[in-house]
Amino acid sequence: MKEVDYDFVFFNGDCIDDPRDRAQASYILKQFTEGVKADQVPVFFMRGNHEIRNAYSIGLRNHFDYVGDKTYGAFNWGDTRIVMLDCGEDKPDDTPVYYDLNDFSQLRKDQVVFLKQEMASKAFKKAKKRILIHHIPLYGYEGNLCNDLWRPVLEKAPFDICLNAHLHKYAYYPKGSQKCSYPVIIGGGNSLKDATVIILEKKKNELKIKVLNAQGETLLDI
């Protein structure tokens, strides 16, 4: 990463595993942010299912400024539109361990409305490139509870790439495979030695994508 010139950084969820208190969360965030020049460039932390769990999950809100003050949203970086979704938990709301405290079903429904409004917006339509980011994959994985709600909306969405995580194993699905209407990249493992870095570089109307593993080896270059 030291040789990569980047404008901002995304961490795509499950970085803070089951946060128990402020000290633990702050320590983990410090480890990640120090390695990516967070004092010089914006850093976005997407919420994965593990950030939702444990005693300090609600306290994480104090550590982040979300775009639009929600865990999902969209913004422009130049003429590129970046759309972020929050998949919530990977288990149904009525799972006993949640004690009827979760309502991620409504969160997923809210994002259907958001997606329709976003894709109808001038900012989305005028963008030269469009990037979709969410933690749990919709394609290449059948366990996403958002599938039935989100897939019909995204089937013909003109995204240039979708970035996912959650499975702890790198994968790449070209457009058309897995019935996806855009290319999908799933990031790597659940430890630093198995991690992947996905580098997106846009010059004029061209979007180049490279994936590196923790050893610096190139896994994908398109």
Task: Name each model feature, range by range.
Residues 9-11, 45, 132, 163:
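Residue-level marker for buried hydrophobic side chains located in beta-strands
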Residues 7, 128-130, 160:
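Conserved acidic residues
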Residues 132-138, 160-170:
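Histidine-centered catalytic micro-motifs
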Residues 201-222:
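A short C-terminal boundary segment appended to hydrolase-like catalytic domains
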Residues 11-16, 119-141:
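Short acidic, glycine-rich surface-loop motifs adjacent to enzyme active sites
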Residues 1-22:
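N-terminal active-site segment of His-dependent metallophosphoesterases
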Residues 23-120, 149-161, 171-190, 194-203:
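Extended active-site neighborhood of metal-dependent phosphoesterases/phosphodiesterases
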Residues 13-14, 48-49, 135, 165-166:
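Active-site glycine-centered loops adjacent to acidic/histidine catalytic or metal-binding residues
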